[in-house]
UniProtKB/Swiss-Prot annotation:
It catalyses: 7-aminomethyl-7-carbaguanine + 2 NADP(+) = 7-cyano-7-deazaguanine + 2 NADPH + 3 H(+). Pfam families: QueF, QueF_N. Keywords: Cytoplasm, NADP, Oxidoreductase, Queuosine biosynthesis. GO terms for cellular component: cytoplasm. One of its GO terms (biological process) is tRNA modification. The keyword Metal-binding does not apply. The active site is at C187, D194. It is an enzyme of class 1 (oxidoreductase). The keyword Oxidoreductase applies. Catalyzes the NADPH-dependent reduction of 7-cyano-7-deazaguanine (preQ0) to 7-aminomethyl-7-deazaguanine (preQ1). This is NADPH-dependent 7-cyano-7-deazaguanine reductase. Homodimer. GO terms for molecular function: preQ1 synthase activity.
């Protein structure tokens, strides 16, 4: 990745920022997906054909026509085929700009979000805004699958390497779902920690649990955005294991009132956005 690309140097991440409380869609900042996909060799043709960056926006407020504050939670899904991902701090600042702005209805807020986010992402974005009474009925869930975290192994290196996946696929063809809650990477710009859980559903040669866990732990000091980490995991698994079918889904903990949950697959649809215990 070109860390000197102007789209990265212009980001507000890590900079002192003025918080605006009047609606301002120009606060949104895009990051071209090709910056990371070029390095993975997947800009022209991605190994996944389904997916989205699913965001939960917990800090959404505006004024109704009488000036009374309103609060809600929004689910946002940015299609993986969009030209850009959306930088998270700019997303937060953009949401803050709704605070002192009057909107006629919740639906008008939803429409504004969809329009602005689609323009920034240069692609399809779906938005659903929920009243709190609707959202509180949603359960807290866990990833289905076998958790691979309780292995008695020694790890003394935390430098990212996909070589941990060498010979990771061995034995009979299986369909299974593996889960780890030990995914941790760092923000590409600020190096702040990003904590997440990852689910890998595949049909292919059975994966060696120890090698897979070592690979996932090697992200611990790795600097990339959430979406980029998931695409890297997907691409590495395709390269090293050549599965018949593959899904990689990560759910990251909240920062600044936002959580990001990238989903990539070559055979499954994007699931319902249900939060986990750490979210």
């Amino acid at each position: 990745m070109n860390y000197n690309d102007k789209s990265l140097s212009a980001l507000k991440l890590g900079q002192k920022t003025e918080y605006k409380s009047e609606y301002d869609p120009t606060l949104l900042q895009p990051v071209p997906r090709k910056l990371n996909r070029d390095g993975l060799g997947i800009t022209e043709q991605q190994p996944f054909d389904r997916g989205a960056d699913v965001w939960t926006c917990y800090e959404l407020s505006w004024l109704n026509e009488n000036g009374l504050p309103q609060v809600a939670i929004a689910d946002v899904a940015i299609d993986f085929r969009s030209e850009n991902l959306i930088e998270s701090k700019s997303f937060k600042l953009y949401l803050n700009s709704f605070n002192q702005t009057k909107f006629a209805s919740l639906e008008q807020v939803e429409q504004a979000l969809a329009k602005d986010l689609s323009q920034c992402a240069s692609g399809q974005v779906s938005v659903k805004v929920y009243k709190l009474s609707a959202y509180t009925r949603q359960p807290i869930v866990d990833f289905a699958g076998e958790c691979i975290d309780e292995q008695d192994i020694q790890i003394d290196s935390y430098e990212f390497s996909n070589e941990h996946l060498a010979s990771v696929a061995e034995g009979e063809i299986v369909e299974e779902t593996l889960v780890s809650h030990l995914l941790k990477s760092n923000c590409l710009i600020t190096s702040q920690p990003d904590w997440g859980s990852v689910q890998i559903h595949y049909i292919g040669k059975k994966l060696n649990r120890e090698k897979l866990l070592r690979y996932l732990v090697s992200f611990r000091e790795h600097n990339e955005f959430h979406e980029q980490c998931v695409e890297r995991i997907f691409t590495d698994l395709i390269q090293f294991t050549q599965p018949e079918k593959l899904t990689v889904y990560a759910r990251y903990t909240r920062r600044g009132g936002l959580d990001i949950n990238p989903f990539r697959s070559n055979f499954e649809a994007v699931p319902q956005n249900l939060r986990m215990a750490r979210q």
